[in-house]
């Protein structure tokens, strides 16, 4: 007995009875009159996925209460059907709201119960009473119609329909009895589904207007031709074209669905018998174990009314919309965005379906017949159905039988005040009672600024194609019309109209920046040594207008370093002796001599005025001067003696006198080397670094073995090497067991960056509001008491629920407006203007805003492994990357920058970066960037509700029946275009990093970088014999004592793919270059500290070494630059510690002059000319003429006098 009792108590499917405890008489009952066990499974299928209370307390006839679980619903339902004569069972949840959820459904608007309850009240209490108590009673039996979803409606007269009240579709005859017309007691699935909570909120707000099926039967809306699209034979049928652009959802148990098509007519889709519509309403599925409803499912949320407003000349415009469904609004040639959207529409007389950009509704209450509901009671005395009844039920009454004021009618009617103001209300026993239908009246919508009365109005989810309302940010494109000129003073870039505020020029991994007041022309310094070496220079320019940055590649030819780096009065112009012209040499000598004379004269005058024993002070100066003159005379005499000795040996002088006449020519022989003492001074060793940094793999990490002619070496361990400067290479040399077995691991420093380490970030975009409004009179819909004043932003009015179910950002408002007849209301209390506002993205793109919490150095390295394969990696401080031979990590010693907290940055995923001149804000603030911020790009594009907003962003202006909503948001795209990088702030230039992967800063900094190479049992094979090659020296260009270095180029002819290695005699210098089959020119960066380079290398590709002489003249480039410039340059990696050195320079000067003797002679000439000590020198041969300008003058004397012109 207890087991049976437990099973019976587990019942959750019950018939709900609402009992209201008021002083007046009222009774509400739930009932059923038959059972149908075969329909239990179908009912359970529709209920088992619903949310129900976890625990229920149930009691049988109030005797005993037992807790049970809702999971027992299915078995308990079968037990109830099998049992007869059970007593009433009452169930409730943990809190009173659970009782309501069994009828209404849980907060997610789902239904749990499977019975329909109906309320009956006294006529005088209709429209005035409220619910006071709730109870649930399970009856012994369930009615067949009770297996439909629950409909809970506060208005008991929703089934009292206007017009004929027919809600059936042709061909579905099984429900004609209950749907033709809809009655208080009958079940009509085509109509009942419209009253399910949350499914059709617009119709439920205007439920006393006609449904689409009712409008068709009342000849308000016509049927389509053909009226129905049979899915069984719809393959290729054009009737499905419009249906397929709609996004719909159908329950599993409907066989047909209907909608308002593009022509403003009703169309439908249906399945053959025993088939039901699938979830998307596009296919038919055979159903077993469940009965199919013969009603038709509505695919749109709409209501209809009678109207005579003509819409044939009506033209509407939807901003930015190209197509809606199958309607083409305008031709769009640009980029389109396609999505399913909830779009309002309306149908007018003599018009097709009209889609609306927004829906503004207003209702005017009137005294037309459709505004009233009339009813009588079944079994009523002298009623139309006066037979005995077992239940209390109502029956609709035709209002046309009631007499109007001053008119006649066949029946006597009574009703509320509104009814009695238009109809004769009898004081006698009435046949029917009539009252004003809540929410009825003439509904008008605003179309093109005019209020018009539509036949039907509603919402549907349909495909919408929109053009991008604002042009997307253009990519950084090459400026094809810009002009570049390689001028001696810098690289000049001229635009074709836009003004340039800043620019970045890069070449060979070195970048320089420049900023100025906006102008159509900008002059940039040449990066590195590109001015003399030539080549391509990439320039990235920032504009001052609303367009983004642009770029251009300038090509400069190689030029003479002396021409491009020369000057008359400057530090590098002075020390670059090989570049002096006659003018610059004269200026230098004159300036230095004048400075010396002036200093001595001033010193003498000061000492003389102070009378501080000037003779005692001058005596040392005199002695020094005399000593210098003595040395000078001795050197001149020595030179004259040597010249005379040569003349005597060749026979030009006899007894100390020159021989007159023209002696016979004497055969010339190679000169005897008599200046060995002086030539010793030319043996000056110059330092160079070829592979910038080179180490040889030690035996501790190398193990080699020989297998025939092949050698295999295994590397396992760690090697530490300094990174090369930008453009240079660091090399690890691996030698096999043979002399010709050498391979290299080369790591080239491609570029260096001071990159931004990002902190917080958010996504933002261009967002605009869209507002929907509807004015309802007092006591209509949700406009009760002071509800409007207490309306919450997250509370959506019922008529906007269909739109409000989306996940976009939205808010709701209610504004009290005027009431009374002047405002179209019966009630003089204020009406309610309900507003639903949702935000939408204007552009189909989003921007990311971030700040930089730190600036870190990063190197881009190009690694060429032992087999010649090349890979490029990026490494930051203390970071590592794995390779096929092991791993490489980077250690940096550098300083960052500060002062970047006062601005933030914007990133466009495809267009680059921009700077914002305001600090990063952690919370959205009105009037600043990021008023609306989201956590992802997709959230911005969909204006998702998870986005954060600053308060009070939307301003409202209510105007009785309509409303304007506006925002004044900061447009991040305008900010992006205005601040597009590169830009200069705080004497630092910010630009996009290489590959557009971040933001970098230029600050003239330097880093000390070390690379740690970790080898993990990596094998290197030396297979067969090495290839042979020949190399010839081409040229040497660049600078000395500089970070850019010099570039040595060789012409290499090889029989195969391999590598050329070269070293000097003592093994301190190495050059490593790849060799390929054929002849190819290869270059490598070296660093020298002397201007005159002459170094002999031994090169080899196959172990057979041959000599190679590298010789050339280098110049100094700005060794001293104390000017302060805004912007800066790219970071220098491992700057050369050796600066310009006087002794190295002097040794180079002697080498350039041809030796110490020629250097002495040249300076002696200049000194002689300056001091006037000597007027001429005697030499005997023209080939002894000095470089400073010795011109031989022949005279008719025995001797040859040479006039000195210095």
Curated annotation (Swiss-Prot):
Residue spans crossing the bilayer: 583-603, 1160-1180
Site annotation Cleavage: residues: 153-154, 690-691
Region (Internal signal sequence for glycoprotein C): 675-690
Start and end residues of each stretch annotated as Fusion loop: 777-783, 819-830
Sections of the chain in a coiled coil: none
GO BP term (any one): fusion of virus membrane with host endosome membrane
Gene3D superfamilies: 2.60.40.3770, 2.60.98.50
InterPro entries per the UniProt record, alphabetical: M_polyprot_prcur_phlebovir, Phlebo_G2_C, Phlebovirus_G1, Phlebovirus_G2_fusion, Phlebovirus_NSM
Region annotation Important for correct targeting of the glycoproteins to the Golgi complex but not for heterodimerization: where it falls in the sequence: 646-650
GO cellular component: host cell endoplasmic reticulum membrane; host cell Golgi membrane; host cell mitochondrial outer membrane; membrane; virion membrane
Pfam family, one: Phlebo_G2_C
Signal peptide: 1-16
Name of the protein in its database record: Envelopment polyprotein
Provenance organism: Rift valley fever virus
Gene it is expressed from: GP
């Amino acid at each position: 007995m207890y087991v049976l009792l437990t099973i019976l108590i587990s019942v959750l499917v019950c018939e709900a009875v609402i009992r209201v405890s008021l002083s007046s008489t009222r009774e509400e009952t739930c009932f059923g009159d038959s059972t149908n066990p075969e329909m239990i499974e179908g009912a359970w299928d529709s209920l088992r996925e619903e949310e129900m209370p976890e625990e229920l307390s149930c009691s049988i006839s109030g005797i005993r209460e037992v807790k049970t679980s809702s999971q027992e619903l299915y078995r308990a339902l079968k037990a109830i059907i099998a049992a007869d004569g059970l007593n009433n069972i009452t169930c409730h949840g943990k809190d009173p709201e659970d009782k309501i959820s069994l009828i209404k459904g849980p907060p997610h608007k789902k239904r749990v119960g499977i019975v329909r309850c109906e309320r009956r009240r006294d006529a005088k209490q209709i429209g005035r009473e409220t619910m006071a108590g709730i109870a649930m009673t399970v009856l012994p039996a369930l009615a067949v119609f009770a297996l439909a979803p629950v409909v809970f409606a506060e208005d008991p007269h929703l089934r009292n329909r206007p017009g004929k009240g027919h809600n059936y579709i042709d061909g579905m005859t099984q429900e004609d009895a209950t749907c033709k017309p809809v009655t208080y007691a009958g079940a009509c699935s085509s109509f009942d589904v419209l009253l399910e909570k949350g499914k059709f909120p617009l119709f439920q707000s205007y439920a006393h207007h006609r449904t689409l099926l009712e409008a068709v039967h009342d000849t308000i809306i016509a049927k389509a031709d053909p009226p129905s699209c049979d899915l069984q034979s719809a393959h290729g049928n054009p009737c499905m074209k419009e249906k397929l652009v709609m996004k719909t959802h159908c329950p599993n148990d409907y066989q047909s669905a209907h909608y308002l098509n593009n022509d403003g007519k009703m169309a439908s889709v249906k399945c053959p018998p025993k088939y039901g519509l699938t979830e998307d309403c596009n296919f038919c599925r055979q159903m077993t174990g469940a009965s199919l409803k013969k009603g038709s499912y509505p695919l749109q949320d709409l209501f209809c009314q009678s109207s005579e407003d003509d819409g044939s000349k009506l033209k509407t415009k939807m901003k930015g919309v190209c197509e809606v469904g199958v309607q083409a609004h305008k031709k769009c040639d640009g980029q389109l965005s396609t999505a399913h959207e909830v779009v309002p529409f309306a149908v007018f007389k003599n018009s097709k379906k009209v889609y609306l950009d927004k829906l503004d509704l207003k209702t005017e209450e009137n005294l037309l017949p459709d505004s009233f509901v009339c009813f009588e009671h079944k079994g009523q005395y002298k009623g139309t159905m006066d037979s005995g009844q077992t239940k209390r039920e109502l029956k609709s009454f035709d209002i046309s039988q009631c007499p109007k004021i001053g008119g006649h009618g066949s029946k006597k009617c009574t009703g509320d005040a509104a009814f009695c103001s238009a109809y004769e209300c009898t004081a006698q026993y009435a046949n029917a009672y009539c009252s004003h239908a809540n929410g009825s009246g003439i509904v008008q919508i605003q179309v093109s600024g005019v209020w018009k009365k539509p036949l039907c109005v509603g919402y549907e989810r349909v495909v919408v194609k929109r053009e991008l309302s604002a042009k997307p940010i253009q990519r950084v494109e090459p400026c094809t019309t810009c002009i570049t000129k390689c001028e001696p003073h810098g690289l000049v870039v001229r635009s074709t109209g836009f003004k340039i505020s800043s620019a970045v020029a890069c070449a060979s991994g070195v970048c320089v920046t420049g900023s100025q007041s906006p102008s159509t022309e900008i002059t940039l310094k040449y990066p590195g040594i590109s001015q003399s070496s030539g080549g391509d220079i990439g320039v990235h320019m920032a504009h001052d207008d609303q367009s983004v940055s642009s770029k251009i590649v300038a090509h400069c030819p190689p030029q003479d370093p002396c021409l491009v780096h020369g000057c008359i009065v400057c530090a590098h112009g002075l020390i670059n002796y090989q570049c002096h012209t006659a003018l610059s040499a004269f200026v230098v000598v004159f300036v230095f001599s004048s400075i010396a004379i002036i200093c001595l004269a001033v010193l003498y005058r000061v000492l003389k005025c102070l009378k501080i024993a000037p003779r005692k002070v001058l005596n040392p100066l005199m002695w020094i001067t005399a000593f210098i003159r003595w040395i000078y005379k001795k050197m001149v005499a020595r030179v004259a003696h040597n010249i005379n000795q040569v003349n005597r040996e060749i026979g030009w002088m006899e007894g100390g006198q020159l021989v007159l006449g023209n002696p016979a020519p004497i055969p010339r022989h190679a000169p005897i080397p008599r200046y060995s003492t002086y030539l010793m001074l030319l043996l000056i060793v110059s330092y160079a670094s070829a592979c910038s940094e080179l180490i040889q793999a030690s035996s501790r990490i190398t193990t080699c073995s020989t297998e025939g002619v092949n050698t295999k070496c295994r590397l396992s361990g760690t090697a530490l090497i300094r990174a090369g400067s930008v453009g240079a290479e660091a090399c690890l040399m691996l030698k096999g067991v043979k002399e010709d077995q050498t391979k290299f691991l080369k790591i080239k420093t491609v570029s260096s960056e001071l990159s931004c380490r990002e902190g917080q970030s958010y996504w933002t975009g261009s967002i605009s509001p869209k507002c929907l409004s509807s004015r309802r009179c007092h006591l209509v819909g949700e406009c009760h008491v002071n509800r409007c004043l207490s309306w919450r932003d997250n509370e959506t009015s019922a008529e906007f629920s269909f739109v409000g179910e989306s996940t976009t950002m939205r808010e709701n408002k209610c504004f009290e407006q005027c009431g009374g007849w002047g405002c179209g209301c019966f009630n003089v209390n204020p009406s309610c203007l309900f507003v639903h506002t949702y935000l939408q993205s204007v552009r189909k793109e989003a921007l990311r805003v971030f700040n930089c919490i730190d600036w870190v150095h990063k190197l881009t390295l190009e690694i060429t492994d032992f087999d010649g394969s090349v890979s490029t990696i990026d490494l930051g401080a203390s970071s590592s990357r794995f390779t096929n031979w092991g791993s490489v990590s980077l250690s940096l010693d550098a300083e960052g920058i500060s002062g970047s907290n006062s601005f933030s940055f914007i990133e466009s995923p495809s267009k680059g970066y921009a700077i914002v001149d305001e600090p990063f804000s952690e919370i959205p603030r009105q009037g600043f960037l990021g008023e609306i911020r989201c956590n992802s790009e997709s959230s911005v594009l969909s204006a998702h509700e998870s986005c954060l907003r600053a308060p009070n962003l939307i301003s409202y202006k209510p105007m009785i029946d309509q409303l304007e909503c506006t925002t004044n948001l900061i447009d991040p795209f305008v900010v992006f275009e205005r601040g597009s990088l590169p830009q200069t702030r705080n004497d630092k230039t910010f630009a996009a990093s290489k590959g557009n992967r971040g933001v970098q800063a230029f600050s003239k900094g330097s880093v000390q970088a070390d690379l740690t190479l970790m080898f993990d049992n990596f094998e290197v094979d030396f297979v067969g014999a090495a290839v042979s090659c020949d190399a010839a020296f081409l040229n040497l260009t660049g600078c000395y004592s500089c970070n850019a270095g010099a570039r040595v180029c060789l012409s290499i002819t090889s029989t195969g793919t391999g590598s050329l290695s070269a070293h000097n005699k003592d093994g301190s210098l190495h050059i490593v270059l790849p060799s390929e089959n054929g002849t190819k020119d290869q270059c490598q960066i070296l660093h020298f500290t002397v201007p005159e380079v002459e170094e002999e290398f031994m090169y080899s590709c196959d172990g057979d070494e041959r000599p190679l002489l590298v010789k050339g003249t280098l110049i100094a480039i700005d060794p001293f630059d104390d000017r302060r410039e805004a912007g800066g340059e790219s970071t220098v990696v491992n700057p050369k510690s050796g600066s310009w050195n006087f002794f190295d320079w002097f040794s180079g000067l002697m080498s350039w002059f041809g030796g110490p003797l020629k250097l002495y002679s040249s300076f002696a000439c200049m000194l002689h000319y300056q001091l006037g000590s000597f007027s001429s020198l005697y030499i005997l041969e023209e080939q002894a003429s000095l470089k400073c300008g010795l011109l031989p003058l022949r005279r008719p004397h025995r001797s040859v006098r040479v006039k000195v012109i210095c």
